[in-house]
């Protein structure tokens, strides 16, 4: 059916099985040292298995000083990264796909914080108008050094087993900053004339050709058009004719392919298109390049289904179809097309949640997420869906994204699923979201579920509103409520219930507003899109009112810029910083937030866009009847497609899970029903290590009122204390997480294990015996031989920790900051949070928990030695008594071998705490389950 898409092709000497290319796109899955994580390898392997003929992983760093583009980004700056990159290439090759590595330097398009606060670099000292970071021009010598770094990166890529490399000369990054007269004002050999502006790239091409084998593919991704006139720029920049000329020059210099793109950060709306851009919109630009080069052309053009790229191949506009976000949404994109399963395709809706989440999640060291594919970038963590061998009956209430995803997931597990939807079509709020102009792609969501749910055997009942009795009639084993929410109507405002007031659902259902004057209250994206819809339907005037001072705060800026441009063209007026105080027959009264001045806005109709209040009544009624109910989507909190889809997936995935005994720092309260002086630790030697974990793991085990630190950092220390002030020498291992109590930052100790001669006395006299968790009987091994460090920790016959490290440098410079930049001769101070409780005896016998408190240990570290370490291997494992593996290692920041003196300066009570509430969280850190279980206490 799509013969051209699946026709074999060739780039240079590299044979490709089809014409489908997975274009590079950052996902945030690399280790902080630039090596691929196991999760990243799995992510790309699935796309190769899903039919991509060529996989180009995300931007790859070639310079660690000025070239950091993302916190978690793969890198070819060091030889030590090659073995793990080899594993990535091998995983892709395993499925018959080929892989190129994209070599990248961001130049000025990166935040200063990723460079340690230093100015970003560029061809000239011209800041990017989007990032607005302080910018300096590279010296001639620095440019020549970067040329060599690109070449060395290609050499390492070939050694790692990649089939080729792509130079990122697009999207406004460093190489494009040299190519464009807009950003290159240099007067040396790398600026001025057309040839000079291209020199940095042509020198890289020549160097790679000299150092790499003849069969190693080499190409350039080029922004052929910068579109800067759309932003009011009058200076010269790369126009399409210039871009074509650049591509021709690169072909002459020796590249094997051109990957056509457009734009830069300042015109980012053209680089990563929002929902309003149609498939294939770049056709003429791509065609212009294809007509002037003879090497293969790869190009993206917002392809969502197979028809447009097939047509482009048929007419000779492209040689290979590049897809980016489409592979996020459906890793089986290629296979489904080749097997004729087009209706089963989960299409990208161009909502840009992926890019929005990539930025939001970066500070938490977490990857992006996809609004329509809940497994995206978490494939390894989730693993295969658990099969429900008992075929439980599940009723899903609500046919929005959350309910549909829950139904799909439960059905894939083998459950018997019935979905009740009161409307006449699946989709829920998405059916309204697709009503505004240019949002037709939103219909991809219901289209997918309308195909897949019947195919999976889900009993879909449209036009059937659920009640407690109707649901109970199915005798469900579980119910998933995706009942959405009801529009918020602030009843205290006079006139709010008038006949001239409606909410968004009704507003988007009307087909005409011809000649009407309309006010929309609420300047979030929903309100703004509703205003556009009303203007498009013929309203004489549309005004948007809100208390906020900027439209749609917190919204993805690309989507907002796109929408605001259209609203201006439609003359939609925004009155921001104004609070609605009254609704009248002829309009509304608003009050300025700044000074309280009131004014009138004339209107025939008032539309409220103030969000939704979760509809939980049905769920509460079912719970009273003894049914297990999960709430998902807007029935939990008002939100968009992404959390609804993820919530539906996780709710259905977790149903009927085997409740076998598991290791955890947090125990159910039902499992528990049976159940000093400042210290000096001189000459303390051993390991300090930091890594990032899943934020949800910390949230699950952190007792209130402690709040997680913005970066989910776990610290591990394993030390031999040779000269403590209160006992003989002993060994100590601490597992902790950074967190806040109010404004106070500190470390919360999850577990403290002791071993050695003085360990038993240390539990009695060391630190604050009443609030620190301590366990004996641990075996320690700390071996340092030259620059090699190896640490092992075991207890009660179970290995808990194994670490191997090479001393000399960290995995990430962030490690140094986490430990407050230690150095020999330096003193630092810290705070540790610990819980205290009393257990007074009862007159009738027994005891109870009371007197709960959070204490702080204020400590001082006096360093004699601090040797940074690069962790080459780490394993954190759990036993029934010590759940040290419950905080999974996502990315290692680094470690150090230290020699120091630690002094506990004092203890103080910070806050009262409910002993009964927090005790389930501290139990595993203080007591052994195995021992108490054998004694019948738990």
Question: Where are the language model's segments positioned?
Answer:
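Flavin-dependent oxidoreductase catalytic cores
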Residues: 1-397, 401, 409-412, 416-417, ...
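Rossmann-like dinucleotide/flavin-binding elements
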Residues: 388-422, 461-475, 482-555, 591-658
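Rossmann-like dinucleotide-binding cores of NAD(P)H-dependent redox enzymes
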Residues: 416-456, 509, 531-578, 636
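Generic beta-strand/beta-sheet core signal
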Residues: 23, 102-104, 168-170, 176, ...
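Structured soluble/peripheral alpha/beta segments that form catalytic or ligand/cofactor-binding pockets
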Residues: 51, 669-671, 686-688, 695, ...
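N-terminal domain-onset segments
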Residues: 659-730, 869, 873, 877-879, ...
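Conserved acidic residues
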Residues: 53, 163, 256, 319, ...
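Interaction-surface and assembly-scaffold signal
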Residues: 769-938
């Amino acid at each position: 059916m799509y013969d051209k898409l699946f026709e074999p092709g060739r780039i240079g000497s590299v044979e490709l099985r089809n014409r489908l290319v997975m274009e590079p796109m950052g996902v945030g899955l690399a280790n902080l040292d630039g090596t691929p994580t196991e999760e990243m390898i799995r992510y790309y392997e699935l796309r190769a298995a899903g039919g991509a003929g060529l996989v180009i992983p995300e931007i790859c760093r070639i310079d660690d000083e000025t070239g950091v583009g993302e916190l978690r980004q793969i890198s070819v700056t060091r030889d030590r990264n090659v073995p793990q990159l080899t594993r990535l290439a091998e995983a892709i090759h395993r499925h018959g796909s080929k892989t190129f590595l994209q070599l990248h330097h961001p130049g000025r398009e990166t935040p200063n914080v990723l460079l340690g606060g230093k100015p970003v670099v560029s061809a000239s000292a011209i800041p990017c108008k989007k990032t607005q970071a302080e910018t300096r021009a590279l010296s001639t010598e620095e440019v020549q050094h970067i040329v060599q770094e690109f070449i060395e990166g290609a050499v390492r890529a070939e050694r790692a087993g990649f089939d080729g490399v792509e130079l990122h000369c697009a999207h406004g990054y460093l190489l494009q900053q040299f190519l464009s007269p807009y950003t290159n004002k240099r007067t040396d050999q790398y600026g001025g004339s057309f040839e000079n502006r291209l020199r940095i790239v042509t020198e890289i091409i020549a160097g790679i050709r000299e150092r790499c084998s003849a069969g190693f593919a080499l190409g350039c991704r080029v922004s052929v058009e910068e579109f800067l006139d759309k932003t009011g720029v009058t200076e010269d920049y790369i126009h399409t004719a210039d871009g074509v000329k650049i591509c021709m020059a690169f072909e002459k210099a020796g590249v094997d392919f051109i990957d056509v793109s457009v734009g830069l950060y300042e015109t980012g709306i053209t680089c990563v298109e929002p929902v309003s851009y149609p498939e294939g919109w770049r056709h003429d630009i791509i065609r212009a390049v294809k007509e002037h080069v003879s090497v293969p052309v790869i190009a993206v053009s917002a392809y969502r289904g197979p028809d447009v790229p097939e047509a482009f191949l048929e007419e000779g506009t492209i040689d290979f179809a590049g897809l980016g976000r489409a592979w996020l949404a459906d890793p089986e994109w290629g296979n489904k097309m080749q097997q004729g399963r087009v209706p089963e395709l989960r299409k990208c809706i161009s909502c840009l949640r992926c890019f929005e989440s990539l930025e939001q999640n970066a500070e938490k060291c977490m990857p992006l997420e996809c609004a329509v594919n809940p497994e995206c970038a978490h494939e390894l963590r989730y693993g295969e869906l658990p099969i429900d061998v008992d075929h439980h009956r599940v009723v899903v209430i609500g046919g929005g994204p959350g309910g549909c995803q829950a139904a799909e997931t439960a059905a894939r597990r083998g459950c018997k699923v019935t979905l009740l939807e009161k409307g006449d079509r699946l989709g829920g709020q998405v059916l309204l979201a697709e009503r505004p102009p240019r949002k037709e792609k939103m219909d991809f969501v219901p289209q997918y579920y309308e195909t897949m749910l019947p195919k999976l055997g889900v009993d879909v009942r449209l036009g059937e509103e659920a009640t407690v009795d109707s649901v109970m009639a199915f005798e469900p084993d579980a119910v998933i409520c995706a009942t959405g929410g009801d529009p918020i109507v602030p009843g205290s405002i006079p006139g709010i219930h008038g006949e001239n007031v409606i909410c968004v659902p009704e507003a988007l259902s009307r087909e005409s507003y011809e000649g009407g004057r309309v006010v929309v209250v609420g300047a979030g994206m929903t309100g703004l899109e509703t205003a556009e819809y009303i203007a498009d339907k013929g309203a004489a005037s549309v005004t948007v009112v809100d208390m906020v001072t900027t439209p749609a705060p917190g919204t993805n800026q690309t989507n907002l810029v796109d929408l605001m441009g259209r609203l201006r063209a439609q003359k939609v007026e925004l009155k921001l910083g104004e609070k609605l105080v009254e609704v009248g027959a002829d309009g509304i009264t608003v009050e300025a937030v700044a000074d309280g001045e009131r004014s009138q806005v004339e209107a025939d109709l008032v539309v409220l866009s103030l969000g939704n209040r979760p509809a939980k009544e049905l769920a509460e009624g079912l719970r009273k009847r003894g049914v297990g109910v999960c709430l998902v989507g807007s029935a939990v909190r008002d939100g968009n497609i992404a959390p609804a889809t993820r919530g539906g997936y996780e709710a259905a995935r977790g149903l009927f899970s085997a409740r076998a005994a598991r290791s955890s720092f947090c125990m159910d309260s039902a499992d528990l029903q049976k159940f000093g002086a400042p210290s000096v630790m001189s000459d303390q030697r051993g390991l300090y290590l930091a890594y990032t974990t899943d934020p949800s793991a910390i949230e699950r085990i952190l007792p209130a009122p402690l709040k997680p630190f913005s970066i989910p950092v776990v610290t591990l220390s394993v030390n031999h204390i040779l000269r403590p002030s209160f006992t003989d020498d002993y060994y100590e291992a601490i597992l902790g997480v950074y967190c806040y109590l109010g404004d106070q930052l500190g470390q919360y100790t999850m577990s403290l294990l002791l071993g050695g001669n003085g360990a038993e006395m240390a539990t009695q006299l060391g630190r604050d015996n009443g609030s620190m968790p301590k366990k004996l009987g641990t075996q320690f091994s700390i071996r340092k031989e030259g620059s090699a460090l190896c640490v092992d920790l075991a207890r009660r016959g179970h290995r808990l920790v194994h670490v191997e490290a090479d001393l000399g440098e960290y995995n990430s410079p962030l490690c140094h900051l986490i430990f407050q930049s230690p150095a020999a001769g330096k003193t630092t101070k810290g705070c540790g949070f610990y819980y205290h409780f009393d257990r007074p005896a009862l007159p009738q016998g027994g005891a109870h928990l009371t007197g709960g408190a959070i204490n702080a240990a204020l400590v001082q570290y006096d360093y004699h030695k601090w040797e940074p370490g690069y962790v080459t291997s780490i394993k954190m494992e759990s036993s029934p008594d010590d759940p040290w593996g419950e905080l999974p290692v996502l990315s290692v920041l680094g470690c150090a071998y230290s020699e120091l003196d630690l002094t506990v300066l004092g203890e103080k009570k910070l806050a009262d705490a409910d002993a009964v509430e927090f005790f389930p969280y501290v139990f595993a850190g203080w007591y052994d389950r195995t021992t108490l279980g054998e004694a019948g206490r738990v």
